[in-house]
C-alpha cells in the first residue's frame, strides 16, 4: 500500500537514503577488516607471536566469525533497505529462493548433483541436517537479488533478464570457490577439477540453480519493487559482497581467479553501463510501499 502522503513519503525516502549509505559503509568496512586480517594473519599465523593472548584467541575463532558475520551483516543491510523501500513484499521472494537454494545444496552435499560432490566444514555451523549451513541459502538470496535487479534494468525481456542475471550471479562464484575451498577450507571438494580444485560441473550447477532462482523472481515480477532502489546501490551492494572472496584470492596469490572474475564482469558490465546511462545510476522509481 502507498506511503501516506508526500511528507511521509519524503521522510521515508530520506531515511532510506541514509540507511542505504550507512549499510554500505558498514559492509565495506567489515569486509576490509576481514580481508586485511586474512592477508596479514590468515596467510601467516606466525605473525601472532609476541602479540597479546587475546589476539591469538580471537584469531582461532576469526575464520568462522568473519565468514558468518559477513553473511548475517549483508542480509541485515539488504533486509533493512528493502523493508524501508518496499515494505515486506520481498519476503515473498526470500522464502522460495531460500528453500530452492537449500534444496540444491542438500542435493549437492548428498548426491553430488548439481554441483559435484563436496561437504561443508564446521566453520560455517549451524547446519541443516548436518549438511548445509543455515547461512548458505541466505547468501544465495542476497546475491541473486542484486544480480536480478541489475539485469532487470539492462533488459526488458524476461528471458534475457533471467539469463543475464544468472551469469552475474555465476561471476561471483569464480572468486568465491577459490577463496573458500582452495585458499581456505570452508567447504571441501570430493570431486576435483582444474579451476583451483573445483569441478567444471560446479559452474553448470551454479548456472542452472541461478536460472531457477531468477525465473522465480521473474514470475514474482520482482523488478516492480527492486526498481525502487537505485542501480548504483545494487551495483555497490553486489561489489561489497564480491570484495570479500576477491580480496582473499588476491591475498592468497590466486590471480587467475581474480582475472577470470573481473574479465567476466567486465563483459557483463557493458549492458549494465548502457542501462545506467539511460536510467540514471542514482535513480529509482519510488521511495516506499508495502
Locations of regions flagged by a protein language model:
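Aromatic-rich, lipid-facing transmembrane alpha helices and their immediate juxtamembrane interface loops
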Residues: 2-290
Amino acid at each position: 500500500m502507498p506511503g501516506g502522503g508526500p511528507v511521509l513519503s519524503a521522510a521515508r525516502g530520506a531515511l532510506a537514503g541514509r540507511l542505504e549509505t550507512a549499510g554500505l559503509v558498514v559492509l565495506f568496512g567489515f569486509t576490509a577488516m576481514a580481508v586485511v586480517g586474512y592477508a596479514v594473519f590468515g596467510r601467516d599465523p606466525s605473525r601472532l607471536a609476541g602479540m597479546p593472548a587475546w589476539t591469538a584467541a580471537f584469531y582461532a575463532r576469526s575464520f568462522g566469525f568473519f565468514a558468518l558475520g559477513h553473511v548475517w551483516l549483508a542480509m541485515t543491510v539488504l533486509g533493512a533497505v528493502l523493508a524501508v523501500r518496499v515494505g515486506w513484499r520481498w519476503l515473498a521472494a526470500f522464502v522460495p529462493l531460500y528453500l530452492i537454494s537449500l534444496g540444491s545444496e542438500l542435493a549437492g552435499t548428498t548426491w553430488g548433483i548439481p554441483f559435484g560432490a563436496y561437504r561443508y566444514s564446521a566453520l560455517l555451523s549451524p547446519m541443516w541436517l548436518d549438511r548445509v549451513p543455515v547461512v548458505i541459502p541466505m547468501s544465495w538470496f542476497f546475491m541473486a537479488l542484486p544480480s536480478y535487479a541489475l539485469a532487470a534494468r539492462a533488459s526488458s525481456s524476461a528471458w534475457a533478464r533471467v539469463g543475464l542475471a544468472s551469469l552475474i550471479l555465476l561471476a561471483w562464484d569464480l572468486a568465491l570457490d577459490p577463496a573458500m575451498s582452495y585458499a581456505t577450507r570452508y567447504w571441501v571438494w570430493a570431486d576435483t577439477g582444474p579451476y583451483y580444485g573445483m569441478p567444471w560441473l560446479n559452474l553448470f550447477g551454479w548456472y542452472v540453480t541461478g536460472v531457477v532462482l531468477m525465473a522465480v523472481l521473474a514470475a514474482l515480477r520482482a523488478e516492480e519493487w527492486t526498481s525502487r532502489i537505485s542501480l548504483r546501490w545494487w551495483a555497490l551492494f553486489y561489489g561489497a559482497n564480491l570484495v570479500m572472496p576477491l580480496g582473499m584470492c588476491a591475498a592468497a596469490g590466486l590471480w587467475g581467479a581474480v582475472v577470470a572474475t573481473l574479465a567476466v564482469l567486465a563483459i557483463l558490465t557493458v549492458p549494465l553501463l548502457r542501462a545506467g546511462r539511460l536510467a540514471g545510476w542514482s535513480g529509482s522509481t519510488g521511495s516506499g510501499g508495502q
